[in-house]
């Protein structure tokens, strides 16, 4: 019993030491966060400079840089006592997306029904075959005197 009681008080300082990047109980310093997030944006812009512009829409070309950027914004938000994600950080990240990925919209293919000349046979043929096969089964089941 006593050894457990002795270990508990030592556990709290250890947890506090390990949680140096945890949000502070005093609240979020939004001004500090807005000052620190551009450092992450600049680092990301420098890394994206290594990627050809025409490859910016291919996530596999820069996923490591984007992960580093995301980790940086999370760390900077936590350092100033803010949770992540939060509206200010999301707004900053959205701005980075507009800067680098605004031309990466996916053109969705507008799907249309095929023309009636194609659609009608695609519907009628399976229906007719199903009715014909059901009729054949009924007809054969009535003729039990001969085997196939």
Curated annotation (Swiss-Prot):
<dbReference type="GO" id="GO:0007189">
    <property type="term" value="P:adenylate cyclase-activating G protein-coupled receptor signaling pathway"/>
</dbReference>
<keyword id="KW-0732">Signal</keyword>
<dbReference type="GO" id="GO:1990410">
    <property type="term" value="P:adrenomedullin receptor signaling pathway"/>
</dbReference>
<protein>
    <recommendedName>
        <fullName>Receptor activity-modifying protein 3</fullName>
    </recommendedName>
</protein>
<keyword id="KW-0675">Receptor</keyword>
<keyword id="KW-0812">Transmembrane</keyword>
<dbReference type="GO" id="GO:0006816">
    <property type="term" value="P:calcium ion transport"/>
</dbReference>
<dbReference type="GO" id="GO:1903143">
    <property type="term" value="C:adrenomedullin receptor complex"/>
</dbReference>
<dbReference type="GO" id="GO:0150061">
    <property type="term" value="P:amylin receptor 3 signaling pathway"/>
</dbReference>
<dbReference type="GO" id="GO:0001540">
    <property type="term" value="F:amyloid-beta binding"/>
</dbReference>
<dbReference type="GO" id="GO:0031623">
    <property type="term" value="P:receptor internalization"/>
</dbReference>
<keyword id="KW-0472">Membrane</keyword>
<comment type="subunit">
    <text>Heterodimer of CALCRL and RAMP3; interaction induces allosteric modulation of CALCRL function and ligand specificity for adrenomedullin/ADM and intermedin/ADM2. Heterodimer of CALCR and RAMP3; interaction form the receptor complex AMYR3 for amylin/IAPP. Interacts with GPER1.</text>
</comment>
<feature type="topological domain" description="Extracellular">
    <location>
        <begin position="24"/>
        <end position="113"/>
    </location>
</feature>
<keyword id="KW-0813">Transport</keyword>
<dbReference type="GO" id="GO:0070374">
    <property type="term" value="P:positive regulation of ERK1 and ERK2 cascade"/>
</dbReference>
<feature type="site" description="Required for CALCRL interaction">
    <location>
        <position position="141"/>
    </location>
</feature>
<keyword id="KW-1133">Transmembrane helix</keyword>
<dbReference type="GO" id="GO:0015031">
    <property type="term" value="P:protein transport"/>
</dbReference>
<dbReference type="GO" id="GO:0001605">
    <property type="term" value="F:adrenomedullin receptor activity"/>
</dbReference>
<feature type="glycosylation site" description="N-linked (GlcNAc...) asparagine">
    <location>
        <position position="103"/>
    </location>
</feature>
<comment type="function">
    <text>Accessory protein that interacts with and modulates the function of G-protein coupled receptors including calcitonin gene-related peptide type 1 receptor (CALCRL), calcitonin receptor (CALCR) and G-protein coupled estrogen receptor 1 (GPER1). Required for the transport of CALCRL and GPER1 receptors to the plasma membrane. Plays a role in cardioprotection by reducing cardiac hypertrophy and perivascular fibrosis in a GPER1-dependent manner. Together with CALCRL, form a receptor complex for adrenomedullin/ADM and intermedin/ADM2. Together with CALCR, act as a receptor complex for amylin/IAPP.</text>
</comment>
<dbReference type="GO" id="GO:0086103">
    <property type="term" value="P:G protein-coupled receptor signaling pathway involved in heart process"/>
</dbReference>
<dbReference type="GO" id="GO:0097647">
    <property type="term" value="P:amylin receptor signaling pathway"/>
</dbReference>
<dbReference type="GO" id="GO:0150058">
    <property type="term" value="C:amylin receptor complex 3"/>
</dbReference>
<comment type="similarity">
    <text>Belongs to the RAMP family.</text>
</comment>
<dbReference type="GO" id="GO:0005764">
    <property type="term" value="C:lysosome"/>
</dbReference>
<dbReference type="InterPro" id="IPR006985">
    <property type="entry name" value="RAMP"/>
</dbReference>
<dbReference type="GO" id="GO:0050850">
    <property type="term" value="P:positive regulation of calcium-mediated signaling"/>
</dbReference>
<feature type="signal peptide">
    <location>
        <begin position="1"/>
        <end position="23"/>
    </location>
</feature>
<dbReference type="GO" id="GO:0071392">
    <property type="term" value="P:cellular response to estradiol stimulus"/>
</dbReference>
<keyword id="KW-1015">Disulfide bond</keyword>
<dbReference type="GO" id="GO:0006886">
    <property type="term" value="P:intracellular protein transport"/>
</dbReference>
<feature type="glycosylation site" description="N-linked (GlcNAc...) asparagine">
    <location>
        <position position="29"/>
    </location>
</feature>
<dbReference type="GO" id="GO:0043235">
    <property type="term" value="C:receptor complex"/>
</dbReference>
<feature type="site" description="Required for CALCRL interaction">
    <location>
        <position position="113"/>
    </location>
</feature>
<dbReference type="GO" id="GO:0038041">
    <property type="term" value="P:cross-receptor inhibition within G protein-coupled receptor heterodimer"/>
</dbReference>
<dbReference type="GO" id="GO:1903078">
    <property type="term" value="P:positive regulation of protein localization to plasma membrane"/>
</dbReference>
<dbReference type="GO" id="GO:0001921">
    <property type="term" value="P:positive regulation of receptor recycling"/>
</dbReference>
<keyword id="KW-1003">Cell membrane</keyword>
<dbReference type="GO" id="GO:0010628">
    <property type="term" value="P:positive regulation of gene expression"/>
</dbReference>
<dbReference type="GO" id="GO:0007186">
    <property type="term" value="P:G protein-coupled receptor signaling pathway"/>
</dbReference>
